[in-house]
Amino acid sequence: MEHYSLAQLSKALHNREFSSVELTQHCINKIQSNKDLNAFISLDEDQALKEAQSADLVLKSGEGKPLTGIPMALKDLFCTKRLNTTCASKMLANFQAPYDATIVTKFKQNGAIIIGKTNMDEFAMGSSNENSYFGSVKNPWDRERVSGGSSGGSAAAVAGNLVPFAIGSDTGGSIRQPAAFCGISGIKPTYGLVSRYGMVAFASSLDQAGPFAKSAEDLAMILHCMAGFDSKDSTSVDRVIPDYSAEIKNPVDKIRIGLPSCFFQPQVEKGIQDAIHDAVKLFENLGAEIIEIDLKLQPLWVPCYYVIACAEASSNLSRYDGIRFGHRSKSASTLIELITNSRSEGFGNEVKRRILTGTHVLSSGFFDAYYLHAQKVRRLIRDELITTLNSVDVILGPTTPTTAFKLGEKIDDPIQNYLADVFTVAANLAGLPAVSIPTGFENKLPIGLQLMSKHFSENRLLAIAHHYQQHTNWHLANPNKQR
């Protein structure tokens, strides 16, 4: 059953081929037998099995929804009343939220079973999932390599067949990069399509929740459940949500694919370049028109992103002071010492680095030179991408410049870690939807293909990704067989 698509799982559950209890117990067993992946921070076995029993009764009555009885995992920055929400940080190691995030409520209403919460880079800051207070996540394809970050636990859980699907967040590539490293599919929706209420903030103008699954078809099914207006989120957009599952099956004709030359630089591994060119040839053989495009501002993507992201992180994380909630230092005799020591003890090195960077660029002496300038550049980047997407349906390229690197290889070189996001951050800066799907292997490690499209064009984006997966088998590869 672990190799079923979500649609197949749903059909099998509705046809009573196996029960939700059996499926949930199977997932629990897989999680327990793959603890070395370190994909999960918390597991809610008893409650998951209780909910599975209830789901079986609903399914028996014939009133089940598409996700009824299907287990799932949540990145540990979505608030849940039952389980702690740690953000993989000592600062929130014992924090239990008083409410559920909006997407948690939506999944519960649609009958999905939250089996546990996954490991991540602390406060979603990282590209390798080595910055977690609870230890690094291992890649199911090679346990000596990273799973990607910051949603590495969710990606590893799906790639390792521990759960059928999982939810992550994407601030600069934190869904797409782990999806690429782990050989699965993942989408960052348009900013505002999915509610951020109850998702602990890293950089509020960049953060967006999205799903991990094996295929674009599965992503469509999950996204339909997640998307929609939420009055509790001031950035949520009120618009009609298409039936993504139905629309990906529509014929995909006359695709115009933009291919940026800047995506094929020397620092991009040759095996990745070859795999992307093979994908382009396949699209061309299927009738797509390939258009060479020039993204002149691409060299500014990463510096612009890190100025803005760190500035917003500095502001958002100022609330963790040891007074209202979170870690409280025991070695303090004054208020200033309490705040200083609580933050020094509670935050890890990467989080401290980004807070310091953000505080610096927001300071009175550097605000205009860095933060204000970055915001102006962000607008130019957005305008360039939107103008380009007026002449093409999607922008195609590699998700990452390398395959998954070894654990510890880049941990002392933050710049190299930041450059892992070189192709992904633009979608966040512009608020555009982007999907990563598997497109081959290099030295037995997965390669990801990224497709980026116009605002709120997830239906077209997923249809093109699904079209590609109907003519390839990369998304069906299994790390357990590879090993």
Curated annotation (Swiss-Prot):
It is an enzyme of class 6 (ligase). Keywords: ATP-binding, Ligase, Nucleotide-binding, Protein biosynthesis. HAMAP family: GatA. The active site is at 75 (charge relay system), 150 (charge relay system), 174 (acyl-ester intermediate). Allows the formation of correctly charged Gln-tRNA(Gln) through the transamidation of misacylated Glu-tRNA(Gln) in organisms which lack glutaminyl-tRNA synthetase. The reaction takes place in the presence of glutamine and ATP through an activated gamma-phospho-Glu-tRNA(Gln). Its EC number is 6.3.5.7. Pfam families: Amidase. Belongs to the amidase family. GatA subfamily. The gene is gatA. It comes from Legionella pneumophila subsp. pneumophila (strain Philadelphia 1 / ATCC 33152 / DSM 7513). This is Glutamyl-tRNA(Gln) amidotransferase subunit A. One of its GO terms (biological process) is translation. It catalyses: L-glutamyl-tRNA(Gln) + L-glutamine + ATP + H2O = L-glutaminyl-tRNA(Gln) + L-glutamate + ADP + phosphate + H(+). One of its GO terms (cellular component) is glutamyl-tRNA(Gln) amidotransferase complex. InterPro entries: Amidase, Amidase_CS, Amidase_dom, AS_sf, GatA. Heterotrimer of A, B and C subunits. GO terms for molecular function: ATP binding; glutaminyl-tRNA synthase (glutamine-hydrolyzing) activity.
